[in-house]
């Protein structure tokens, strides 16, 4: 087949020349339109179908200067279309449907490319415009062309054509070109300024062609590129026709275009947008489209519904249309493991939370399972950024008893307590228009003011009681404005005050304007917790470890004065008799004392953590709360509850009761009966070596035993008993030292041979007198009685040194201190342990006591610490065990050291709890070790 014969229109230069020639013709020229019509049409057709469609064709067209004549041609057409109707040859008035008249000028007949002589543009003119607008729209798909069109002033002619040429095809291509130009922010602003929006809105209602409607809708969507432009579109009525079209969209393509446009217009939904969409009847179709089979339509519709929730005025209607169920179901699907990413859930979470602001929607959300969904989000650490918003939304259910019961059953209270502990950010502020529509704003005219009020106001201003008319309200009266409490003008801040800062109220203001309590990040969580605490028996939810931990973390960790609501919650719980047993079972009373009174928080144990503290404030609060519990415990109900708990409770409850009693019982008859007569103290001591039921159990136990010791014996016991006085600063004279010199006096008649080969001099008579063991060894029938060099097996020089001193009558000379290692070094396996064993083997009880006293002075004295207590206890000496117990429970030790010492004692005791129990029991009861202890 022969190749197609080349034509003139195959040349871009020829086409551009024809375009330039047509653009340069004057409207009143004498050229016959027929001489240029066919070449121009052929050139435009070739440009659109071949040159522009080719690879790089748009850029070549722009580089060769094709945009300037193309815009000139459109500008001439726009000018002709907007010219006033005049009588003249070849001219006729345009029809009303065209919306404008375009007669030829009086100077002569106009070229057919720009004239109108019929109710619609002439066929040749319409064809020329269709081709030119199509070329321009294609060119505007590239950024460089959009920039040049804007520079050449091509936007205004397009707006004029949109106004004058009401043919669907021309409207379609013009809207398409404007939509492409609107992709540039600068061009978008120029299109708005040129007044294109009302014309596009008019096209929505007048046009019947689906393609044209899609182009107009797309142009409006692209024009909504900023909040200001979206608001302008809504205020110019662009939303309502879109909503009306949504219900009657003839095909899926137009439906998708409408959904995409409404999605863009509803971003940051304005009041005008919501009102127009509601008036246009768009809510029902939107809810229906949420189940559309096409994913793009379905997801776009759901996002539109989510955006609309930002306006309170439309949320009730949205709920009536079924939007609540749609949004809840969609969020539930996206929450599934195989659902969408967390980022895609954010607008839905925000929408569901906003729906909680109206009572009617809260009921729908509750029935749709929204409470379970919100609780799942609260439990999800990946959704932590949304937690403040969700908690604030749940405040809407504050007086919904059924919903509160469901939320409590789902575990809301521990999650709220976690909110008080966390570092979650502030809840995102919503606009004023997102407020609940249960209480819509009403603009009522001001009431007419009576003459008596005007006279009173005039007199108050003249006398200086008011500075202006606004200072006095017609609603004010002495009965409505209670007097302010008498307080100094500048009260001095007291460190023990726990009140939140208050703001003075102006007497002339209405009582409704009273300043409420501070509302910070923790406000919603505290409000919900306060509501739960007002139940008849809130113990199951609030008197638990997590709940108390969260409240106390907030109270002690707040940078400023904590919210009074948190203090009221704690006070309300401690004053409620129904909560007494829960405070005992959960170690809540012990936690209040440890955290608030003693300043030891769970995360400060066992290693302290640096934190800013206001201990005096917290101590006052803790003592007040414990006093509340004391009142409950010493009431007839409390006595019965504690007695039942101690005698008939589970083993864990009995131990918790025994531990808590010294903190909340001050009546001697009560604590003596429960702890001493009915075995509560022994229960507590026996539990020390069992697995701890609470992270701070041993700290609590040390504090409890110390408090009980103070109750039993108000006088303070010395930390180190004075069984054998030993003044280390001025030791007694040494009686053994003369035997060690070069000329000993008296001369030794005996030497002891150690395993190391060292020979130690001794006096036979003194050694036999000091110990029954050596008396039998050296004066009896043993072979050693005839020997001058007596071996002492299993004894090192350091351990033998205090033995030799003691045999020769040294008491308090300091020799007993020699084998004792300094604090921080182990005693087991040391020469001190060896010396103690030797003293027992050689029947030297005085030496044993002296060595034990030396160990106590070094390891349990001022230089020793709680870590030494366990080391001393490991020696297994009853007197040293008593030393350790007295050191641990001594009132001069800080609570932290007491707790750490008890931890060391329990570790040292291991499974053999008997010696530790007896030592602690004897110290608490004030009984010397070895005496009879009451059963």
From Swiss-Prot:
**Looking at the keywords, is Ubl conjugation present?**
yes
The effect of residue 318 to V is: In AIMAH2; uncertain significance
Compartment annotation: Nucleus; Chromosome; Cytoplasm
Q: What's the effect of swapping residue 702 to E?
A: In AIMAH2; likely pathogenic
Effect ascribed to mutating residue 394 to P: In AIMAH2; uncertain significance
Q: Which UniProt keywords apply?
A: Chromosome, Cushing syndrome, Cytoplasm, Disease variant, Nucleus, Phosphoprotein, Repeat, Ubl conjugation, Ubl conjugation pathway
Pro residues bias locations: 480-494
Consequence of substituting residue 315 to W: In AIMAH2; loss of function in promoting apoptosis; decreased association with POLR2A component of RNA polymerase II; reduced ability to promote degradation of SREBF1
Impact of mutating residue 323 to D? In AIMAH2; uncertain significance
Q: Which SUPFAM superfamilies match?
A: ARM repeat
Effect of changing residue 793 to Q: reported as: Found in patients with myelomeningocele; decreased association with POLR2A component of RNA polymerase II
Please give the biological process terms from Gene Ontology that the record holds.
adrenal cortex development; anatomical structure morphogenesis; CD4-positive, alpha-beta T cell differentiation; defense response to virus; in utero embryonic development; mesoderm formation; proteasome-mediated ubiquitin-dependent protein catabolic process; regulation of steroid biosynthetic process
| GO cellular component: a single term | Cul3-RING ubiquitin ligase complex
| Location of Phosphoserine modifications | 341
Please state the pathway this protein functions in, per its UniProt record. Answer: Protein modification; protein ubiquitination
The impact of changing residue 662 to H is: In AIMAH2; uncertain significance
The BTB domain is annotated at: 748-816
Q: What is the effect of changing residue 580 to P?
A: In AIMAH2; uncertain significance
Q: What is the effect of changing residue 754 to P?
A: In AIMAH2; loss of function in promoting apoptosis; reduced ability to promote degradation of SREBF1; decreased interaction with CUL3
Q: How is it modified after translation?
A: Ubiquitinated by a BCR (BTB-CUL3-RBX1) E3 ubiquitin ligase complex, leading to its degradation. Deubiquitinated by USP7.
- Region entry Disordered, spans: 82-122, 424-451, 467-515
| Residue windows of the ARM repeats | 143-183, 185-225, 227-267, 271-310, 312-357, 359-403, 405-444
Bias class Basic and acidic residues marks the residues at 432-446
**Per the record, what is the consequence of mutating residue 736 to S?**
In AIMAH2; loss of function in promoting apoptosis
Function summary: Substrate-recognition component of a BCR (BTB-CUL3-RBX1) E3 ubiquitin ligase complex that terminates RNA polymerase II (Pol II) transcription in the promoter-proximal region of genes. The BCR(ARMC5) complex provides a quality checkpoint during transcription elongation by driving premature transcription termination of transcripts that are unfavorably configured for transcriptional elongation: the BCR(ARMC5) complex acts by mediating ubiquitination of Pol II subunit POLR2A phosphorylated at 'Ser-5' of the C-terminal domain (CTD), leading to POLR2A degradation.
Q: What is this protein called?
A: Armadillo repeat-containing protein 5
Instruction: Give the species this sequence originates from.
Output: Homo sapiens (Human)
């Amino acid at each position: 087949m022969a190749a197609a014969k080349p034509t003139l229109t195959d040349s871009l230069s020829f086409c551009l020349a024809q375009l330039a020639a047509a653009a340069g013709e004057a409207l009143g020229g004498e050229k016959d339109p027929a001489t240029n019509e066919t070449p121009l049409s052929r050139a435009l057709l070739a440009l659109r179908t071949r040159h522009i469609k080719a690879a790089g064709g748009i850029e070549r067209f722009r580089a060769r200067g094709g945009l300037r004549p193309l815009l000139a041609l459109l500008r001439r057409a726009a000018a002709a279309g907007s010219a006033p109707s005049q009588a003249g040859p070849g001219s006729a008035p345009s029809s009303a449907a065209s919306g404008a008249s375009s007669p030829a000028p009086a100077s002569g007949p106009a070229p057919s490319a720009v004239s109108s002589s019929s109710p619609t543009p002439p066929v040749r003119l319409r064809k020329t415009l269709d081709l030119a607008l199509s070329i321009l729209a294609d060119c505007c798909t590239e950024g460089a062309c959009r920039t040049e069109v804007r520079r050449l002033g091509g936007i205004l002619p397009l707006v004029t054509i949109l106004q004058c040429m009401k043919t669907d095809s021309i409207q379609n291509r013009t809207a398409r070109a404007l939509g492409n130009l609107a992709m540039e922010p600068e061009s978008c602003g120029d299109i708005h300024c040129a007044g294109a929006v009302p014309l596009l809105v008019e096209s929505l209602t007048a046009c019947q062609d689906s393609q044209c409607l899609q182009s107009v809708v797309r142009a409006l969507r692209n024009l909504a590129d900023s909040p200001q432009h979206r608001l302008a579109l809504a205020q110019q009525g662009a939303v309502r026709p879109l909503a009306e079209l949504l219900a009657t969209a003839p095909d899926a393509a137009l439906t998708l275009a409408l959904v995409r446009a409404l999605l863009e217009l509803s971003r940051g939904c304005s009041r005008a947008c919501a009102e127009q969409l509601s008036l246009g009847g768009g809510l029902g179709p939107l809810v229906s489209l949420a189940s559309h089979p096409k994913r793009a339509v379905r997801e776009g519709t759901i996002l539109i519904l989510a955006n609309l929730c930002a306006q309170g005025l439309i949320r009730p209607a949205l709920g009536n249309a079924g939007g609540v169920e749609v949004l809840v179901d969609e969020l539930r699907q996206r929450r599934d493991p195989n659902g969408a990413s967390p980022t895609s859930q954010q607008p839905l979470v925000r929408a569901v939370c906003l729906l909680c602001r109206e009572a009617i929607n809260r009921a729908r959300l509750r029935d749709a399972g929204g409470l379970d969904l919100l609780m799942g989000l609260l439990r999800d650490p990946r959704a932590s950024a949304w937690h403040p918003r969700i908690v604030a939304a749940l405040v809407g259910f504050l007086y919904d008893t059924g919903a509160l019961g469901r939320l409590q059953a789902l575990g809301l209270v521990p999650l709220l307590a976690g909110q008080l502990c966390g570092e979650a950010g502030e809840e995102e502020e919503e606009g004023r228009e997102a407020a609940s529509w249960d209480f819509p704003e009403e603009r009522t005219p001001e009431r007419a003011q009576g003459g008596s009020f005007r006279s009173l106001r005039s007199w108050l201003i003249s006398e200086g009681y008011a500075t202006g008319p606004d200072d006095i309200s017609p609603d004010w009266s002495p009965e409505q404005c209670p007097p302010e409490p008498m307080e100094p003008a500048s009260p001095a801040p007291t460190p023990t005050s726990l009140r939140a800062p208050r703001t003075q109220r102006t007497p002339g203001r209405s009582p409704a304007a009273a300043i409420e309590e501070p509302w910070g990040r923790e406000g919603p969580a505290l409000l919900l917790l306060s509501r739960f605490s007002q139940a008849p028996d809130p113990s199951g939810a609030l008197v638990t470890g997590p709940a108390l931990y969260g409240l106390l973390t907030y109270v002690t960790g707040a940078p400023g004065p904590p919210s009074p609501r948190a203090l009221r919650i704690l006070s309300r719980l401690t004053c409620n008799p129904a909560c007494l047993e829960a405070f005992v079972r959960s170690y809540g009373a012990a936690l209040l004392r440890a955290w608030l009174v003693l300043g030891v928080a769970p995360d400060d144990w066992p290693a302290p953590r640096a934190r800013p503290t206001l201990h005096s404030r917290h101590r006052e609060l803790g003592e007040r709360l414990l006093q509340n519990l004391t009142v409950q415990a010493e009431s007839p109900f409390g006595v019965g509850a504690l007695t039942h708990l101690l005698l008939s409770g589970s083993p864990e409850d009995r131990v918790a009761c025994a531990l808590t009693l010294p903190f909340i019982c001050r009546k001697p008859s009560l604590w003596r009966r429960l702890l001493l007569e009915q075995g509560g103290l022994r229960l507590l001591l026996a539990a020390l070596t069992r697995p701890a039921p609470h992270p701070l159990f041993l700290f609590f136990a040390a504090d409890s035993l110390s408090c009980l010791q103070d109750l039993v014996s108000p006088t303070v016991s010395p930390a180190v008993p004075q069984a054998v006085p030993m003044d280390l600063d001025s030791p007694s004279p040494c009686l053994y030292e003369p035997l060690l010199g070069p000329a000993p006096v008296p001369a030794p008649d005996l030497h002891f041979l150690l395993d190391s080969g060292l020979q130690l001099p001794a006096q036979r008579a003194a050694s036999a007198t000091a110990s029954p063991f050596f008396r039998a060894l050296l004066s009896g029938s043993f072979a050693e009685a005839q020997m001058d060099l007596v071996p002492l097996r299993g004894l090192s020089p350091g351990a033998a040194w205090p033995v030799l001193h003691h045999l020769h009558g040294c008491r308090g000379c300091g020799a007993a201190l020699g084998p004792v290692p300094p604090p921080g070094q182990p005693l087991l396996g040391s020469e001190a342990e060896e010396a103690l064993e030797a003293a027992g083997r050689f029947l030297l009880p005085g030496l044993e006591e002296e060595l034990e006293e030396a160990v106590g002075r070094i390891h349990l004295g001022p230089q020793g610490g709680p870590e030494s207590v366990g080391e001393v206890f490991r020696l297994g000496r009853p007197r040293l065990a008593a030393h350790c117990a007295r050191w641990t429970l001594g009132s001069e030790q800080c609570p932290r050291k007491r707790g750490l010492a008890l931890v060391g004692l329990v570790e040292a005791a291991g499974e053999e709890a008997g010696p530790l129990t007896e030592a602690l029991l004897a110290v608490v009861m004030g009984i010397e070790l070895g005496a009879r202890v009451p059963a």
